[in-house]
Amino acid sequence: ENTSVLGTPDVLGYNSHQYFFTVELKIANGSKVRLSPHQISFHILHPKNAFILVKTKADCRLYSGSQVRELFEKGLSVKPIVRGLRESCLYFENIGK
């Protein structure tokens, strides 16, 4: 958790295609995904190559930063970009390909 700049995602990544991306890491409690106002604001202001990776009891789900409002309001009923940790890693690696 970055306390210097509130809302900054947990992961600042850079792939082999020289594309920068961010990932907010979350653990779902039931069907809800808790996001702070600062985290929501970050993803609204920086929707490109910004992601939210949510760990559920069953799997991991990757959401686009542009889905942040819907994810906050509707929780896990929102359709993710991909499901699974491996699939999420492949998605990050293919940004900009």
Language-model features: locations:
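A short acidic/basic microdomain associated with nuclease active sites
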Residues: 1-4
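Conserved catalytic cores of phosphodiester-cleaving nucleases, focusing on short active-site segments
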Residues: 11-13, 18-29
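Acidic, Ser/Thr-rich peripheral helices and adjacent loops at domain boundaries
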Residues: 70-76
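Mg2+/Mn2+-dependent nuclease catalytic core
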Residues: 28-47
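Charged phosphate-binding loop/patch that engages nucleotide di/tri-phosphates or the phosphate backbone
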Residues: 77-97
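Nucleic-acid nuclease catalytic cores
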Residues: 45-70
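Beta-rich catalytic cores
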Residues: 7
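Helix N-cap / beta->alpha transition motif
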Residues: 36, 63-67, 84
